[in-house]
Regions:
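Hydrophobic alpha-helical bundle signature of multipass membrane enzymes
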Residues: 24-190, 221
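Bacterial N-terminal signal peptides that target proteins for export
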Residues: 1-9
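Short alpha-helical linear motifs
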Residues: 129-135, 160-162, 198-206, 226-229
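C-terminal membrane module of polytopic membrane proteins
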Residues: 209-235
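Interfacial helix-loop-helix junctions of multi-pass membrane proteins
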Residues: 182-213
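Bacterial N-terminal signal peptides
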Residues: 8-19
Length: 235
């Protein structure tokens, strides 16, 4: 009897928990078709071309000269994907936190769904091996990242985050894009991307951003987030 009672309680708990999880699932702003950006990007350099060899030599040259500070930064920056708040905190200050900006956090949670669903098909479309997969002389600083090399997800994420935050705080536009470029460069320093992957990521962000900004729901959420950020930053 006790076993039956416990089983009944477990089943009843699932009927409560599962709908709650479904209700809190985060969705993006765009349709599946709007997320398709792969064909808008220039292809990466083909294998055995001068451009690809130059790409590899750039990775090896950076690897040979990377400093202790660059290595530490590359490892820190690895955790900045899908993370608008730590990305911009050194620009906006220590109070730029999720707890103080719930509307902004909700906006980026939805945007990052669109980002992820745009990025991974583009990577699969081009299927470019990572530098360390193509040449054993490349010694990556990080565990193998998910997906192929082109375009860089961290670069795409950084520039997309900078683009959206610049809509809220245009006074900080230059600093935000400098941060994006620095974060992207960390991927080459880490040995997990080629320079052309970073350019592909930047172009991917500029392809996706106009589609996001044309979405009425995103615009409404963006305006609310803008007020929240500027109020908390006392701008």
């Amino acid at each position: 009897m006790l076993t039956i009672y416990r089983t009944t309680l477990f089943v009843l708990s699932l009927t409560v928990i599962l709908p709650l999880k479904a209700a809190t699932a985060v969705t993006g702003y765009l349709s599946a078709e709007q997320r398709q950006i792969a064909t808008l990007l220039p292809p990466p350099p083909s294998t055995d071309t001068p451009q690809n060899r130059a790409d590899l030599q750039a990775v090896l040259a950076i690897q040979a000269n990377r400093t202790v500070e660059q290595i530490a930064k590359a490892k820190r920056d690895d955790h900045l994907e899908d993370a608008a708040f730590p990305f911009a905190r050194e620009i906006f200050g220590p109070t730029f936190t999720v707890d103080r900006h719930p509307l902004t956090a909700a906006l980026f949670r939805r945007v990052y769904q669109d980002f992820e669903q745009s990025l991974m098909p583009a990577k699969a479309f081009y299927g470019r091996p990572r530098p360390y997969e193509a040449d054993s002389r490349v010694k990556p600083l990080l565990p193998p990242p998910e997906g192929d090399s082109y375009p860089s997800g961290h670069a795409m994420d950084s520039y997309l985050t900078a683009l959206l935050l610049a809509q809220m705080v245009p006074e900080k536009r230059s600093a935000l894009f400098e941060r994006a470029a620095s974060n992207a460069q960390s991927r080459v320093i880490a040995g997990v991307h080629y320079p052309s992957d970073l350019e592909g990521g930047k172009l991917a962000a500029t392809a996706l951003a106009p589609r996001l900004l044309a979405n009425p729901q995103l615009q409404a959420d963006l305006q609310r987030a803008r007020v929240e950020v500027r109020t908390n930053l006392q701008l």
